[in-house]
């Protein structure tokens, strides 16, 4: 028997009744790669908001006319199928202008456009929240979403959403390395870490980072708006 033969081949034992141990060689990922993966996680979770919001807005324009964008929220909230709106007045270039549609088409178009607008309003918050989730897991979601909302409020847009998502994820991840008392451990991922991370990220955005990031976002928008046709084509080739 092999147990009595000193020259018999030995097989390394595995704890747990023969189940193979998981490979750990792929766990040593650098921080740059880890942040890149988290950003891609945020983008992948943001895409459904883009798809739903963009398509609903386009359907609203198709049904209610392009000018439904100026009155969609008011019409959707103030009127109903039993109280259809007349043509609505909105301001365009300082002059009162009537919408091109009225009645059922205006109301349905306004409902679609309003839903699309509500969906698009979540883009930056979703991007930031799920970047933080990609870095820190569940404790990073709330701080990331709140940081994204602050980014929108201060005008930092997508640049701010990227920054707040990464910040929230890294701060929440650091808090998870702490070793609290046993009686506090159950509250850490659902209360303590989200609370402290939100405070850190929100304070940094409102006090320190918000205005510079908003200026960078404004500069980027102005640069893209001022591009000529040839420059736009070149940028498209570079971006791919």
Residue map of PLM features:
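Signature of multi-pass transmembrane helix bundles
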Residues: 2-240
């Amino acid at each position: 028997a092999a147990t009595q033969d000193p020259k018999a081949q030995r097989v390394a034992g595995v704890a747990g009744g023969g189940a193979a141990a998981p490979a750990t060689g792929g766990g040593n990922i650098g921080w740059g790669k880890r942040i890149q993966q988290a950003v891609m996680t945020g983008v992948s979770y943001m895409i459904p908001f883009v798809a739903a919001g963009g398509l609903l807005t386009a359907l609203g324009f198709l049904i209610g006319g392009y000018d439904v964008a100026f009155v969609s929220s008011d019409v959707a909230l103030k009127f109903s199928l039993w109280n259809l709106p007349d043509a609505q007045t909105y301001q365009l270039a300082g002059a009162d202008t009537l919408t091109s549609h009225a009645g059922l088409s205006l109301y349905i178009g306004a409902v679609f456009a309003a839903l699309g607008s509500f969906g698009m309003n979540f883009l930056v918050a979703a991007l930031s929240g799920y970047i933080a989730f990609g870095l820190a897991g569940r404790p990073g979601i709330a701080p990331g979403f709140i940081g994204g909302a602050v980014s929108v409020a201060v005008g930092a847009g997508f640049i701010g959403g990227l920054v707040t998502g990464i910040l929230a994820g890294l701060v929440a991840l650091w808090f998870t390395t702490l070793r609290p008392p046993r009686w506090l451990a159950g509250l850490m991922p659902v209360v303590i870490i989200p609370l402290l991370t939100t405070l850190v990220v929100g304070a940094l955005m409102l006090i320190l980072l918000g205005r510079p990031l908003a200026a960078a976002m404004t500069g980027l928008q102005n640069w893209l708006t001022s591009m000529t046709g040839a420059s736009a084509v070149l940028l498209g080739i570079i971006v791919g």
